[in-house]
Amino acid sequence: KFVAQTGRLPRLSDPIPAHHYAGWALPMIMEGHRILPDVPDRWGYHLRILEPQHLPDEPIPQIHFLSGPHHDTLKHLHQWIRLAANHQSTWTGMTNFIEWLAYALQVSQTPTRLDDAIQVELYQHVNLLEMVQHPYDYFGDIISEGLDNGPWANPNKFYPTPMEICRLMAAMTLPDITKVSLQKIKNLRTAKIADPAGSGTGRMLLLASNISLSLYGCEKDPLVRTVSLINGALYAPWLAFPIPDHILESDLPTDAATSDNATCTQALLAPGHLQA
């Protein structure tokens, strides 16, 4: 509504500052996908599906996730979490930061409880494009390992599967798209792929996003589930903002190609997208 009325994005100096709008950070992420070198334009691809209501002719832009966190990006995340702590525990800082980030990326409609002054500092200092340029599940590591050697809560004892193990599991479970035809690669985009046994922060689903636009998960920990949606907004928008079924169903493969889709679907199907 603000953009429609003013023709521009909200600013920090506006009567209602930019960070008070749900999804204020999404335009930056979309633009990063579009212009940053070596970053696949997955947001552009996602929007080219939603606007005309059908799948484009080109296959899914491929993304390579790092095996571990990028050093400087992780260091900056630690700094932003300490800023969000506002003299409280670092665990509280992390949950505050995740809450703030979820609202900024519109995967949550609940505004953060942080003081406005802290939100302004975060708005001025946080550069989410660092994470976009160095794709990895950073919060999965942070939730399980903490910051440096200080006290850490992790009350639900969340410990993610290492990314390289996830990569191996994905290679064993999912079709190898480097060995099939372009038509089969495009057909697999509508296959339903799920991680139903506790999808965690979404590592398996992020890897599967190179194959499918129909990703499903199940996670009971609300903090961890929120992180998986944040990861989706950063790296695989169809995980955080699912493509409507009528679009995917209108592009279902036919004849011989259907068998490839069905094999993938039957192996990993779960009833629902990212569920609690």
Functional labels for PLM-detected ranges:
Residues 255-276:
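SAM/dcSAM-binding transferase cores
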Residues 162-260:
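Conserved S-adenosyl-L-methionine
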Residues 1-159, 233, 240:
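Non-catalytic, mostly N-terminal accessory regions of nucleic-acid modification and defense proteins
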